[in-house]
């Protein structure tokens, strides 16, 4: 620590600082450092004013030579810092801290030297060096957060002149002891906020600085120096300060009012310590001011009696003076409350309409929905019109040509021409329609009725999409949840079609870094799939929320549970089952399906006469056709039924009757597992009606698409309104399905004709509908 400084020397230093400008432009400005020059050029001629004093560069009791370098420009790289700091000594490493996502610099770095002496020299010579036009701030790196956050030796200085920067503040307070860090608070533009912090190594140095610099003049401004109070301690006293305020804020003051009149207005309520009217750079009043009383009672009485009182023809506002951050917080809360109130006000009455034709404007949109109830507003969203476009210039020339011809016309003709010009001018101000808009009703019931009747209605050959308007964040969350659920269902259906065990249809398991999922070996002799429960990867450790390793279900050739080997991710033993998204696994499934398609179902399939498992392997216990097989794996859920044929799936998804197949389970008469029983097993596997409809829709759509490819989606949606039992019958009876599709087409054609209004023309043909599809898709993308 530095030796104590005599009070006379401190007073002399303060006097010098008070009579000297600390801004840039004099010998106090930090020199711009060229990283190609010698280290000696970093030092200035006057060590007392241009750089840190010897006390601040004294050997620091650090076990490592790690320096913190702050206030860096975002474009500063490790190479730039190495070029600068390597001139002091051997640099072990340099790291610029960056954002983990954007990789943008956070404005600070760490420089590690091989020796502590090099770190001390760099702290003394390179502190406040200009790097990319900004003075860097260097201090010892403190790895212990408890020591970094302690308030011991931390001094707060306020009412600083804007010309005082980090270096000038460091030079002022370095005479009292070793400074660990020194910083002047700045705004986003780099301008001083008028306060700063100095962190000393010891409390004694901080006490000396407070004693000798508090209430002294620095650049002709009296500064306040005191111990720094942590924010959490200030917040705890904030409510008490609010209840016992003495400073009041007054606005709506007449611009002709003087300071004396303003003070006399409040003097009769108690002893006024200070009063001030805010003025601009020209000395004119800004219409507000502040008054501070000695006691809270006087301030409260003034607020109570003067708030709303007339003064020089204007009603005053008198209230407790608030900090800027407090006022901003209140404004933020009031804005949020108003936004929520507005959202609740229009909840259930504001409709969102998309897939609008380009020629539909606000008036036509209002007319379309006016039959359902009173409308408060209707708006079609449009692109912004750019001024000076080529079209406007062309129209301007046409306007001039028309004007010459109108000079010889009669007064009525001129009036009509002026009206036409006004209409054209108004049309030019409207940009191109974005294809969507909003309609707000006054009654939620009217809005609900409009959604029910206008959604999917054909308007000018395009089906409208009408729904309740939602906030952007709510809509985004719903879309993400819907996409996730849809992907999950597709994974389950793909796994079922590929003949995967039930475990592969579950939600993927997240594995923490450093943890590897493991795979169990097959449970039966020659078994191509793991038996019940073995397909799910197991996680080592058994922490909460993770799946434990599944026990083996036994079977011929299977090993006891304690002898099961554990295989790391990506390495599978012969016959083990990889994850469904593995490219090798998908290729194997495709190969098996091709082989099955070539061989066909029936003879040679699992369970058939002479039937064998995949790759010529014998059928294990628990597989279709094997001993004890009832069509279900040990987990109780049915396997996919399209596994006929030798070694793989067969056409039609039917099994040939096998010697080892008992008559139990979902086997149909004659021992064949047909598509109906498979569909029934899928429907009974879930109790969710929405998922059942989804399964039926997935089975209906390809059949309907073969009959009506253009309207397959709409017809499928119409048929899904039927009961599930009727839908299953349609899937089994091809003739009934064709009849029902024809009936749905007739109903749809009749509906389209009934909705056609005058002037809208006939329903679009198939070619027109196909040509209209790209426009609809673009409109949906824009929406």
UniProtKB/Swiss-Prot annotation:
**Low complexity biased stretches:** 54-65, 630-641, 656-671
Compartments where found: Cytoplasm; Nucleus
Give me the stretches of Basic and acidic residues compositional bias.
Answer: 396-406, 417-428, 770-783
An example Pfam family from this entry, by short name, is MLLE
Q: Which residues form the RRM domain?
A: 65-143, 153-230, 246-323, 349-471
Annotated Gene Ontology cellular components are: cytoplasm; nucleus
Q: Name one GO molecular function term.
A: RNA binding
Q: Where is the composition biased (Acidic residues)?
A: 407-416
Region annotation (Disordered) maps to 16-65, 381-428, 596-671, 752-783
Identify the domain of life: Eukaryota
The UniProt entry, under SMART domains, shows: PolyA, RRM, RRM_1
PROSITE patterns recorded for this chain?
PABC, RRM
Which residues does the UniProt record annotate as the domain PABC?
Answer: 676-753
Q: Where is the composition biased (Gly residues)?
A: 601-614, 642-655
Per the UniProt entry, what are the Gene Ontology biological process annotations, in alphabetical order? mRNA processing; mRNA transport; regulation of translation
Q: Which UniProt keywords apply?
A: Cytoplasm, mRNA processing, mRNA transport, Nucleus, Repeat, RNA-binding, Translation regulation, Transport
The main location is cytoplasm
Function noted in UniProt? Binds the poly(A) tail of mRNA. Appears to be an important mediator of the multiple roles of the poly(A) tail in mRNA biogenesis, stability and translation. In the nucleus, involved in both mRNA cleavage and polyadenylation. Is also required for efficient mRNA export to the cytoplasm. Acts in concert with a poly(A)-specific nuclease (PAN) to affect poly(A) tail shortening, which may occur concomitantly with either nucleocytoplasmic mRNA transport or translational initiation.
Q: Which family does it belong to?
A: Belongs to the polyadenylate-binding protein type-1 family.
Official protein name in the record: Polyadenylate-binding protein, cytoplasmic and nuclear
Q: Which organism is it from?
A: Chaetomium globosum (strain ATCC 6205 / CBS 148.51 / DSM 1962 / NBRC 6347 / NRRL 1970)
